[in-house]
From Swiss-Prot:
Protein name: Catalase
Lineage: Eukaryota, Viridiplantae, Streptophyta, Embryophyta, Tracheophyta
EC number: 1.11.1.6
Cofactor: heme
Group of enzyme by EC: oxidoreductase
Species of origin: Vigna radiata var. radiata (Mung bean)
């Protein structure tokens, strides 16, 4: 019998109970004891195996995005973008690619409510013919900080207090008071969008700036946008309390039940592109993850549609063990020098190796559906059967060759080595424009949320003054209104 034909799978379940090694178990209810009331014997291997397995069921949860829900479906190209990219999965309208998508909250634990004010993760894994492509984004188009050096401290500030394990506003406001670049992100997070109704009724964004390369080697910067066809809907405070109090997994259940009922969620994919030769023409840096690209001057271009039409078969295998990394790209898509993207390229894969082990890409949910070949052998939990005699490259005994060369951006770099912020910070303009675009009632809700946060008794007068200064620079009336509610005087 070929042992590799019967790899562990529910498809090969026996009609009776067995141990992990396949031995039959005739009693799964009682331990092996001396008589009916005597001590349990250590030789009861089935009991020991059962308890030992149970003790190790849980794996480390994600340091961020721990709470999540996944679904499967397909991506279909609807518009020709072959002039922009040589990516095979985008080669022509009508091409379909299988996908798995994971939605998530960001800061709190695996079992936390899905009604908290928090960004939502929107990660898509494309199983293309040229390998996997992970587009790992959020439901908000910008981020808190522009340099990954700040990321660990940022997460620490947003996470619960290490002393009492309570998320506290004074810690968040203290940290970000040092970084006015966060203002634009807070204009989204403290807006109504900060609590989506569920995962179906929110947009998604690649957030970072990537690069597309066509067959001729021409490169353009690109931003990815997912637009829900269900409409964007949010929960206001009283609604969030009611929904979360009734069901702390409401968004997970909504996603599952909608797909099970045949009401398949769908998103349209759009892109924005900038020629790198024109990147200096704007009053913002196109590689700054705290900025959006104005759609009136950089219009959205339609690309395709994402449809989720199948629920996952197993939550642990296809959600907890599902792993994404922005470094996983395909020919025709490349990174940019976006500082946050550059750090995510390392950090995500490193985090997955910690959670799942060095061979996490061999797990079924993470492995490519296309043929693949390398000499990354062995290591913990490598369960792939290999019978090659040559595990080095090159070799005259192994016909494997290099793949055909594909274009990458032909950038030339020149400069001094230094740790320095970007020149075009422009931290206040877009946040102010966003606030002024809202109806008065929406502005009032935003102001109330900021007043509530700044009213935390541990927020000092100095920190309140900094935030009033920031919001005044974004919009003078906004800063004045926040100051008035706090019985303070604007300092700008």
């Amino acid at each position: 019998m070929d042992p590799y034909k019967y790899r562990p799978s529910s498809a090969f379940n026996s009609p009776f109970w067995t141990t992990n090694s396949g031995a039959p178990v005739w009693n799964n209810n009682n331990s092996l004891t001396v008589g009916t009331r005597g001590p349990i014997l250590l030789e009861d291997y089935h009991l020991v195996e059962k308890l030992a397995n149970f003790d190790r069921e849980r794996i480390p949860e994600r340091v961020v995005h721990a709470r999540g829900a996944s679904a499967k479906g397909f991506f279909e190209v609807t518009h020709d973008v072959s002039h922009l990219t040589c990516a095979d999965f985008l080669r022509a309208p009508g091409v379909q690619t299988p996908v798995i998508v994971r939605f998530s909250t960001v800061i709190h634990e695996r079992g936390s409510p899905e009604t908290l004010r928090d960004p939502r993760g929107f990660a898509v894994k494309f199983y293309t013919r040229e390998g996997n492509f992970d587009l790992v984004g959020n439901n908000l188009p910008v981020f808190f900080v522009r340099d990954g050096m700040k990321f660990p401290d940022m997460v620490h500030a947003l996470k619960p207090n290490p002393k009492n394990h309570i998320q506290e506003n004074w810690r968040i406001l203290d940290f970000f008071s040092h970084f006015p670049e966060s203002l634009h992100m807070f204009s989204f997070l403290f807006d109504d969008l900060g609590v989506p109704q569920d995962y179906r009724h929110m947009d998604g964004f690649g957030v970072n700036t990537y690069t597309l390369i066509n067959k001729a080697g021409k490169a353009v910067y690109v931003k990815f946008h997912w637009k829900t066809t269900s409409g964007v809907k949010c929960l206001l405070e009283e609604e969030a309390i009611k929904v979360g109090g009734a069901n702390h997994s409401h968004a997970t259940q909504d996603l599952h039940d909608s797909i099970a009922a045949g009401n398949y969620p769908e998103w349209k994919l759009f892109i924005q592109t900038i020629d790198p030769e024109h990147e200096d023409k704007f009053d913002f840096d196109p590689l700054d993850v705290t900025k959006t690209w104005p759609e009136d001057i950089i219009p959205l271009q339609p690309v395709g549609r994402l449809v989720l039409n199948k629920n996952i078969d197993n939550f642990f295998a296809e959600n907890e063990q599902l792993a994404f990394c922005p470094a996983i790209i395909v020919p025709g898509v490349y990174y940019s020098d976006d500082k946050m993207l550059q750090t995510r390229i390392f950090s995500y894969a490193d985090s997955q190796r910690h959670r799942l082990g060095p061979n996490y890409l061999l797990l079924p949910a993470n492995a490519p559906k296309s043929a693949h070949h390398n000499n990354h052998h062995e290591g913990f939990m490598n369960f792939i059967h290999r019978d090659e005699e040559v595990n080095y490259f090159p070799s005259r005994y192994d016909p494997v060759r290099h793949a055909e060369k594909f274009p990458i951006p032909p950038a030339v770099f020149s400069g001094r080595r230094e740790k320095i912020a970007i020149e075009k910070e422009n931290n206040f303009k877009q946040a102010g424009e966003r606030f002024r675009s809202w109806a008065p009632d929406r502005q009032d809700r935003f102001i109330r949320r900021w007043v509530d946060a700044l009213s935390d008794p541990r927020v000092t007068h100095e920190i309140r003054s900094v935030w009033i200064s920031y919001w005044s620079q974004a919009d003078r009336s906004l800063g004045q209104k926040i100051a008035s509610h706090l019985n303070m005087r604007p300092n700008i």
